[in-house]
Amino acid sequence: MELVVKSVAAASVKTATLVIPVGENRKLGAVAKAVDQASEGAISAVLKRGDLAGKPGQTLLLQNLAGLKAERVLLVGSGKEEALGDRAWRKLVASVAGVLKGLNGADAVLALDDIAVSNRDAHYGKYRLLAETLLDGEYVFDRFKSQKAEPRALKKVTLLADKAGQAEVERAVKHASAIATGMAFTRDLGNLPPNLCHPSFLAEQAKDLGKAHKGLKVEVLDEKKIKDLGMGAFYAVGQGSDQPPRLIVLNYQGGKKADKPFVLVGKGITFDTGGISLKPGAGMDEMKYDMCGAASVFGTLRAVLELQLPINLVCLLACAENMPSGGATRPGDIVTTMSGQTVEILNTDAEGRLVLCDTLTYAERFKPQAVIDIATLTGACIVALGSHTSGLMGNNDDLVGQLLDAGKRADDRAWQLPLFDEYQEQLDSPFADMGNIGGPKAGTITAGCFLSRFAKAYNWAHMDIAGTAWVSGGKDKGATGRPVPLLTQYLLDRAGA
């Protein structure tokens, strides 16, 4: 779908479908009044009959109104006079998109300037959410279906903006388009079956991306290099699988050579059986999504590349497959990490932190401004926060605050959890420097505490996306593309874009 921005009068546009808002109690804003006047009171007449109550997201399609060049006019309810929240705004836009998809029109014009959104400016903030909602709603994953989705008639959507705000709306569309590209790439990787999407496949994806972008350097560390670097924890996770582990390094130089990079670290467990600590069979198919941390880093990089942000960014994807076999890691094994610290592996299903801890140590060599790791790390995070918000922890209040703010602005929220010293005690082991689990209490926090022991050399934050990375079961099952909006917003803010 192509999104364009224009500054013209709604009543004069020629289009298959013109979309205008109508408030409750037959309230017409400036746009609706102008269209009503041009159509000789057709809008008012419909409202007087009570055909549309004007509640947020309600729609009514009108055909061939006199005095207009638009073939159809779609009225959408905008509610009472107060501003809509982010959720209501997104639902309204999705409602409009749903109607437009069912029509045979190749284009549509949205004249929604009269709708206010809480805590969003009238141009960039409001239209960024609108554009992301439209573009993300276009996503279809039918690669393995013998019968593909029908091509959609709607090819172009024009957003009408006032002249003063047109440039900001265009900037919003540009950013939203890049984020949507990144989210779609993330969702594609997450939705792929694990027999195809394994560590070596992700390495090939990285190489292909490097070939397509001159400013991107790609290095793939194989299992021998991982072992030679002393990454005993990382190596242990993949040793039970026929698919060897890979540490994928993508280095984007968009800033000055002297600028310290931001580092994103993604957990890339392409399939997680739990290893010897085997997971229950029910729902195990969804463990292909255990690489969504790495996928979201990939997607964020895609957005950064599209926008050519003036920053330096290093992406580290810690990829392995966690399988049981005669050569797999056992509960009770002790491994030495790249940092020199030893870990007693009490549960092989707590494997994500093992690939991440060595990767966090590896990140030190880049002398980063900040390091953010993203992982579908703990089921405990789903229990604590559900699927609406990602868990967030860190060792630097400014960094955590910047990420929380980015989440609010991108409508991709996170919630901070503590890393108090008392939780560290739960990781004590009688045989090694630490165990890889901290008991049944505060599982998300103790996982963060574990990682914090390997991130003392820099400002660091950890995002647990176990509840937000994919939707379980039902017709909407699949990867969500989160937290690409949050991460991209954070980098946009750092770049001043």
Curated annotation (Swiss-Prot):
Cofactor: Mn(2+)
Function: Presumably involved in the processing and regular turnover of intracellular proteins. Catalyzes the removal of unsubstituted N-terminal amino acids from various peptides.
GO molecular function, one term: manganese ion binding
Binding site for Mn(2+) 2: K267, D272, D290, E351
Upper taxonomic lineage: Bacteria, Pseudomonadati, Pseudomonadota, Gammaproteobacteria, Pseudomonadales
Keyword tags: Aminopeptidase, Cytoplasm, Hydrolase, Manganese, Metal-binding, Protease
Keyword Cytoplasm (UniProt): yes
InterPro entries for the chain: Leucine_aapep/pepB, Macro_dom-like, Peptidase_M17_C, Peptidase_M17_leu_NH2_pept, Peptidase_M17_N
Gene Ontology cellular-component annotations: cytoplasm
Cofactor binding description: Binds 2 manganese ions per subunit.
BP-aspect Gene Ontology terms: proteolysis
EC main group: hydrolase
Natural source organism: Pseudomonas putida (strain GB-1)
HAMAP family to which the protein is assigned, alphabetical: Cytosol_peptidase_M17
Active-site residues, Swiss-Prot/TrEMBL: K279, R353
Protein's UniProt name: Probable cytosol aminopeptidase
